[in-house]
Every structure is written in structure tokens, then in C-alpha cells.
Amino acid sequence: MSIKEQSLMTPYLQFDRSQWAALRDSVPMTLTEDEIAQLKGINEDLSLEEVAEIYLPLSRLLNFYISSNLRRQAVLEQFLGTNGQRIPYIISIAGSVAVGKSTTARVLQALLSRWPEHRRVELITTDGFLHPNQVLKERGLMKKKGFPESYDMHRLVKFVSDLKSGVPNVTAPVYSHLIYDVIPEGDKTVAQPDILILEGLNVLQSGMDYPHDPHHVFVSDFVDFSIYVDAPEELLQTWYINRFLKFREGAFTDPDSYFHNYAKLSKEEAVNTATSLWKEINWLNLKQNILPTRERASLIMTKSANHAVEQVRLRK
């Protein structure tokens, strides 16, 4: 079978970095280097070049999709003779722990909000929809944080369902990585944004991923465009360990940190601890629950060293 025939059999169009960068067209750079520095994660190199070559073409594509969706809504309103409610366009971002989902989400939020249309863009992470630690302890799930059974899926589905139904004000719980728990009574109100970016491990999952909790509607049913941030497993492990070491010298030194004891570890002890956490929890979750959802995404971004995207696959 020829390469051309093989490419016809995949549901994705494939682009290397230079091919994808060319699709930026004439979209202007709207972020400064200082702003980009504020958007990047603790363990990531995010350059002006990366934003220009990867994220500007992606924001251009998303702007086309969002405009098309608005035209479709207008057609329906014209047909029904109604003035429709403001229904947000939902973009989901999935991928492994430490792959850089949060940075991708923040960069897209910044870029999409600066298009000439001045759309309002909200960012919500699914961490807030984890069951509180007290519930996880009662169910013996503290070492399963991030696994499907650790989430209040009914609340998460209701959140996105209400947004798509035009409910004016919808609340989302907020998670604190400092205390490693959902903040009691710390809900955030989301008031009919034009775009919602939903970032988390579980946003591409469907019924087959929740055999323990059968229900018929899932987050993915309400998502308009989904992104999976991918990277080789050996890089993910390295990034996870490096991030842990930086937290050990930073966030973990806070006496209020749930992981304050880790700040006292030697570097060797910290590397061993992070490696165990990766293998026993995060790698397992990746293999069992996250990676199997990759091919459900509208777009797959594959990273190489230094968090640089080397390939983009776009669903036809």
C-alpha cells in the first residue's frame, strides 16, 4: 500500500511543524514576550516562535469554526423566528499529567480573546469536579485522583449541559493545588461566555470509560472542538519528575502545602518519589484512561523535547 493510500485511510490530515506554521497566513501576533512568559507552566519553554508557528494557526482555525457555528445558530434562529440565547462554543483540551494542557489552554484563551470580535473566553479546569478529599478517603480513592471514578461526573456534565442550554449563570467548583483539594464554597460563576475552554484529563471520555457509573450523557457530547496534547511516554515521565523537583523548591516549601513534607527530601529521594508516583498513578491512568481517548480528538498536537510541537493532526 502506498503512502498516499495510507493517508487516505486515516480520519486525520497530518502536518509537520513547517506545514502547520504556514497556515498562520497573515494573523498578527497579539502577545508580547512578557505576556507569553506569564502564560507558560513551571516546567515549560514557551517561546514567541512556538506561539507564532503553532498557536496562531490554531487560533485562526478555531476562529473559522466559531464563526461558522455562529452562522449556523443564526440560521436556526431565522428558521424559528426567535432571538436565540447566547450559547458558548466549547473547546476541550485533554492529555496526560505534565504534558502542558494548562499552558495550551491559557495561550488559546489569550489569543482567542484578542481577535477583532473581542469574544469573551472563560477557562475552567475539570480538577474542580474531583470529589473532595473527604469523599475520596471514604471510598479509598486518594491514590486514584484523576481516574474516572474520582470525579463527580454528574456535576461536570450538568455544568456543561447548563452552559449549552443557555443558563445565564453556571457555577463551577475550584480546585487548589496548594491544599490538594476542592476549595469549600469557592465556586466560580461562569456567565454565558462566547467561548469556554475546558481543560482536564477526562474531557474526551465517554460511556465505555465509566462502567462503574452508567449514565447516558458525557462531557464530550457538548464539546464543539477537542484537542489532545500528546508526547512520548519517556518525555512525559521526565517532565513530571522535573516539575516535581521545581515544586519541591517552590510550592512545596509553603507550610500550607499538602505536600510540604516533600520539600525536605534530598534530590535523589525526590526523584525516586516522583518516579514512583508517575509509575504507580499517573502512568497507569494515562495507559488505562487517557491515551485510549486520543483518537476521539478533533486535533492532536504531538510534542517533542522542550515542549515544542513537532506534528499536528487535524480530523478531516
UniProtKB/Swiss-Prot annotation:
Q: In which pathway does this enzyme or protein participate? A: Cofactor biosynthesis; coenzyme A biosynthesis; CoA from (R)-pantothenate: step 1/5
UniProt keyword terms in alphabetical order: ATP-binding, Coenzyme A biosynthesis, Cytoplasm, Kinase, Nucleotide-binding, Transferase
Please provide the Gene Ontology terms (biological process) for this protein: coenzyme A biosynthetic process
Task: Mention any one GO cellular component term assigned to this protein in its UniProt record.
Answer: cytoplasm
Q: Which residues bind ATP?
A: 95-102
A GO molecular function term, named singly, is: ATP binding
EC number(s) on file = 2.7.1.33
Q: Does the keyword Transport apply?
A: no
**Keyword Nucleotide-binding attached:** yes
- Location of this chain's protein in the cell: Cytoplasm
Where mainly located? Answer: cytoplasm
Q: Superkingdom of this entry's organism?
A: Bacteria
What reaction does this catalyse? (R)-pantothenate + ATP = (R)-4'-phosphopantothenate + ADP + H(+)
Which Pfam families does this entry report, sorted A to Z? PRK
UniProt lists the family membership as follows:
Belongs to the prokaryotic pantothenate kinase family.
Could you identify this protein by its name? Pantothenate kinase
Q: Which organism is it from?
A: Salmonella typhimurium (strain LT2 / SGSC1412 / ATCC 700720)
**Gene symbol?**
coaA
